[in-house]
A protein has these predicted regions:
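Conserved non-catalytic scaffold segment of RNase H-like nuclease domains
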Residues: 1-79
Length: 79
């Protein structure tokens, strides 16, 4: 079994960027066994070029959970 994790962030690079969406799929080689997807409030504005790239807007994440609010779920699904 393995996990496939996809994240979208507020920008390129690793310094100062925040997650805006996370998707996790648990795969056994034949089929997806578990799936988790959530928008994430990055607590900073999403630049227009990232919105154009991902389709994720500031309005979409305004009331989404902050990462620390879903961290336990992320940990549990990837154990």
């Amino acid at each position: 079994m393995y996990s496939v994790v996809d994240i979208e962030t507020t920008g390129n690079g690793y310094k100062g960027q925040k997650i805006t969406e996370i998707s996790i799929f648990i795969f056994d080689g034949q089929q997806i066994l578990k799936e988790f997807t959530s928008l994430v409030n990055p607590e900073q504005n999403i630049p227009p070029f990232i919105t154009n790239l991902t389709g994720i807007t500031n309005a979409m994440v305004r009331y989404a959970p902050k990462f620390h609010e879903i961290a336990r779920q992320v940990e549990e699904i990837t154990k």
